[in-house]
Amino acid sequence: MEHTYQYAWVIPLLPLPVIMLMGFGLFLIPTATKNLRRIWAFPSILLLSIAMVFSLHLSIQQINGSSIYQYLWSWTINNDFSLEFGYLVDPLTSIMLILITTVGILVLIYSDDYMSHDEGYLRFFVYISFFNTSMLGLVTSSNLIQIYFFWELVGMCSYLLIGFWFTRPIAASACQKAFVTNRVGDFGLLLGILGFFWITGSLEFRDLFKIANNWIPNNGINSLLTTLCAFLLFLGAVAKSAQFPLHVWLPDAMEGPTPISALIHAATMVAAGIFLLARLLPLFISLPLLMSFISLVGTITLFLGATLALAQRDIKRSLAYSTMSQLGYMMLALGIGSYQAALFHLITHAYSKALLFLGSGSVIHSMEPLVGYSPDKSQNMVLMGGLRKYVPITRTTFLCGTLSLCGIPPLACFWSKDEILSNSWLYSPFFGIIASFTAGLTAFYMFRIYLLTFDGYLRVHFQNYSSTKEGSLYSISLWGKSISKGVNRDFVLSTMKSGVSFFSQNIPKIPANTRNKIGSFSTPFGAKKTFVYPHETGNTMLFPLLILLLFTLFIGSIGIPFDNGVKDNRILELTILSKWLTPSINLFQENSNSSINSYEFLTNAISSVSLAIFGLFIAYIFYGSAYSFFQNLNFQNSLVKKNPKKSFLDEVKKKIYSWSYNRGYIDFFYTRVFILGIRRLAELTHFFDKGVIDGIINGVGLAGFCIGEEIKYVGGGRISSYLFFFLCYVSLFLFFIP
């Protein structure tokens, strides 16, 4: 067994040979390399598959033995300092290795078809393979300095992939925004690492955990200083995992290709922050004040992400805010000490969200022939609808991913989210209320995405009403792009055939000839008309969807209790995940060591599922085809007429819609306070530098020049005059000296 662990260092290095070969090929024989570019996908997938098999073997050994293996190499600088580096294999590492390799392989397979017509096909595969290498290196790191090194590589790869289509100004601005926002967290992480190195003289995890176990309880170290350094480490996780208030980069990261959006949101970049917090949880758990702050940040993030997803029109941005909210659940779980629940939700969410993002890519792929290749149209749910008839496989997989994220049993996210909700109620009723209410919101906005995309009728004709300036409203306004004033914010979607908005006083009127076009898109070619419909994607893109569907259906079983024998007349029940993980730092570990209370489990499950079903029902009323039924019966109109507070309710609806659609005005606040403030400070500094500093220097030079000119004319070039003035100055000097 130990012989196998000795070669675990190979796993992060396996994708590197293909990267190097593609680089050499593009440098030495660029024409041949580009002509044979589709061949390079096979070795990329093959080597990552080998890494997956190796990771699976390590995971099986971890489940059976739950042992921790660490290998270190020491590089001695001098007698007082040596740098150690190596790799660590424990249950957390094995979980992340399986997650990264499985999702990475499916994304690579999907990308082969999705990016096949892109000129940057080879560049994309180089970036994404290096992304996988960086993340694999991060999760196997044995100390903080190695984590920071791979942490920066992950950030660099995300910058390159978000700005992959860098010729588009919005994409270029989005990658800059992600880079600068993460710089804030990375700087905090670096300061935290340096702070703990100053305290302990080491960067190894075991020394940090020694602080938690021995020094802090015995007052052997300043707890305030330790809390400050730990907070700086947490700041790095806040930026990487898009937690409030450093979440603003995540929606704009959707400017990259859809496969990389799936990888970022499922298994790599945003998972890095959760991984760092889970890795250092033995340290954080000894600092109760910081743990409370972590849980508070997670609670704010999960609720904020859900509210911001309520009115988004871009399908990928809606899923991005969903990711932000689910990461908030994980952060909340870690903050209350529920280590197992957080990692369980990380696993289930990764496969469900990868399924949803790849499904959205399939939808975008099918819409592009109809509306064009601009993301403002191909990703706009205003123009979708009725796709269930045209892309049935994508629709089925997307529905399963949606229901999983809503928390509907027996799909994956039900088991993990229910565990987080239960633990939240045990820790604090306040956190429990917010988390449960957000679970209902999650069901609402996720089913809204599904209904607007697949239910009702195709709304391609609305592209005439969708101004291109609208894109600036949810694009990179933080980086100097003006916000359009001409957007109709009262335009709220429904999937019904005979109308466009609900609960709106001003319903846009659609010309009759336009209304007749619903269901198809007519493209004129001379005297003929070719009707273009959405179509299902190829098998290469459907295969990853079906595999992820299986994960979504069955991965939750690792958290289902099973019989583990009888002790003290009680049936002991464990889960595969509890055997996999080390439960010693889980504050709720007693649940895994005692008999399961079936009544309590059913009560919690019924409560969470009821909230989810209620959210689904409300979403179906607002956005589903059933709305046309209510409208035809005049049920809704009569209800509104009888309501004396109609204007107040309309105003509340508009405020909520405006809050959500404009990202809670957080980007606007950052623009006014930070971006414009820094620019004004830069202008003031520039003025001070040019007007004051340069003025003093130039003034001194000019004064010297003028004085010299005056003295030149006084002397006249005669030596006798120079001697006369010299003697005068000497006389005055001697006269004033006592």
Swiss-Prot record:
- State the reactions this protein catalyses: a plastoquinone + NADH + (n+1) H(+)(in) = a plastoquinol + NAD(+) + n H(+)(out); a plastoquinone + NADPH + (n+1) H(+)(in) = a plastoquinol + NADP(+) + n H(+)(out)
Which Pfam families does the record cross-reference, listed alphabetically?
Proton_antipo_C, Proton_antipo_M, Proton_antipo_N
User: Can you name the source organism?
Assistant: Saccharum hybrid
Instruction: Indicate how the chain sits in the lipid bilayer.
Output: Multi-pass membrane protein
EC number, as in UniProt: 7.1.1.-
Q: Name one GO molecular function term.
A: NADH dehydrogenase (ubiquinone) activity
**Origin, by domain of life?**
Eukaryota
Fill in the subunit field for this protein: NDH is composed of at least 16 different subunits, 5 of which are encoded in the nucleus.
Q: TM segments?
A: 9-29, 39-59, 89-109, 125-145, 147-167, 185-205, 219-239, 258-278, 280-300, 327-347, 354-374, 396-416, 425-445, 542-562, 610-630, 691-711, 717-737
Keywords noted in UniProt: Chloroplast, Membrane, NAD, NADP, Plastid, Plastoquinone, Quinone, Thylakoid, Translocase, Transmembrane, Transmembrane helix, Transport
Primary enzyme class: translocase
The processes (GO biological process) annotated in the record are:
ATP synthesis coupled electron transport; electron transport coupled proton transport
Q: What is its main location?
A: plastid
> Which lineage ranks, top first, belong to the organism behind this chain?
Eukaryota, Viridiplantae, Streptophyta, Embryophyta, Tracheophyta
The name of this protein is: NAD(P)H-quinone oxidoreductase subunit 5, chloroplastic
For this record, the Gene Ontology CC terms, alphabetical, are:
chloroplast thylakoid membrane
Q: Which InterPro entries match?
A: NADH_UbQ_OxRdtase_chlpt_su5_C, NADHpl_OxRdtase_5_subgr, ND/Mrp_TM, NU5C-like, Proton_antipo_N
Query: Could you tell me where this protein is found in the cell?
Result: Plastid, Chloroplast thylakoid membrane
What is the role of this chain? NDH shuttles electrons from NAD(P)H:plastoquinone, via FMN and iron-sulfur (Fe-S) centers, to quinones in the photosynthetic chain and possibly in a chloroplast respiratory chain. The immediate electron acceptor for the enzyme in this species is believed to be plastoquinone. Couples the redox reaction to proton translocation, and thus conserves the redox energy in a proton gradient.
Q: Which family does it belong to?
A: Belongs to the complex I subunit 5 family.
